[in-house]
Amino acid sequence: MLTIELNMYHSVALGAFLFWLGGVITDKVSLLSRYCIPAPLVGGLCFSILNCILYSMGITSINFDATLQTVFMIMFFTTVGFTVSIPALLKGGKAVILCLAISIVMIPLQNFLGGGVMALFGRDPLLGIGCGSIALVGGPGTAAAFGPDLEAAGVVGGSVVSIAAATFGLVAGSLMGGPTAKRLIEKHDLRPAPVTAGGTTPSSALATDVASEDERFISDSPRFVKGFMLLLLAVGIGNQVSVWLTALTGLTFPAYIGAMLVAVVVRNVMDGVHVSYPAEEIDTMGNMFLSIFLAMALAGLKLWELIDLAMPMVICLVLQCVVMFLFSYFVVFNVMGRNYDAAVMTAGFIGFAMGATSNAMANMQVVTKKYGPSPVAYFAIPMVGGMFIDFFNAVLIAANIGWWT
């Protein structure tokens, strides 16, 4: 089989093309836009399906370089930090605690569901944990980390199972989040909270699609340069902040968490000393970074790993989707306040509890693009999905493995 290796330049060029392709398809297929399916997801999945077909026929396999994909992800989260003011941080405090509590409940729920299904089929219950929070709440990184632990506990193919389930979760989380939020918003006739004079909200330019002609703003080159330099400053300092936090606490703080926190400080210092802040320019750059990152991430999915799943795994993953929808629709939405912010956070919760924080942000942004901003959701979801939940997930995974052995 011919193997095609795309370097980081080829990969980012392909991601740009797939974003445009996804935009054309979503414009032509009303069902996709009606249910808030992001354009990068559509374009990326089109390519990953093609890649899967070529791989299955033994023709070729296409591999991506994720170097720039990671950079774009960090840059995007930095722009999210720049949208947050101190009042928004204080307002998001309760939301962060509640969202974290709900997420902690979801972890054993996923694991016991997976383990129970596998036990019913006469399989090792630990295989179900590989289809549970290891892959879903944890995502591909946690799946790669805990897969060998499952194999050490006697589960044959634990790594492959976990990574394949995580791949499924990325797709499912992206597909489920937008439509669920749409249903909640329209059923309860929800609207964004009015913006106070001192508050800030993420602008529509942070949505998944590039700004339309109705979202124009007046700018110039110096303002874009100033915004980009602020981003680079926050990314550089934030990376070191993440290193320090990891060393001090023993927890793993991703680079984008530090960058996001530094961006919050820079933004509020600039506002406090009344220095001009290029809000629209940074928001527009955030839109670009997210769009290309998500297209590249989806294009790189190895969908053929799903084809090789045994029937119990398929049933387990389908049930995980059903339980996730029911839990999000009836529990997350109600606990978080039954308002517009709660609906947006429901989309984000599905994204990171089924896949990754990047999926959560994409889900929320495609919803807020259509219905309006949600500052609380924009701060709470990345903080829970990117900073806190990995620690609790690791502890509960270890406890659940001990339960089934």
Language-model region placement:
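C-terminal ends of transmembrane helices
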Residues: 20-33, 79-91, 180, 265-279, ...
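Structural signature of hydrophobic alpha-helical transmembrane segments
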Residues: 3-17, 63-76, 126-133, 250-262, ...
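Hydrophobic transmembrane alpha-helices of secondary-active transporters
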Residues: 18, 45-52, 65-93, 234, ...
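Alpha-helical membrane segments and immediately flanking helix-loop junctions
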Residues: 113, 117-157, 161, 168, ...
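Intrinsically disordered, low-complexity non-transmembrane regions of multi-pass membrane transporters
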Residues: 1-12, 182-228, 271-275
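Juxtamembrane and boundary regions of transmembrane helices in multi-pass small-molecule transporters
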Residues: 116-123, 166-208, 330-340, 385-405
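Entry/N-cap segments of selected transmembrane alpha helices
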Residues: 85-115, 167, 299-329
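Flexible hinge motifs at transmembrane-helix junctions and intramembrane kinks/re-entrant loops
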Residues: 25-41, 53-54, 58, 62, ...
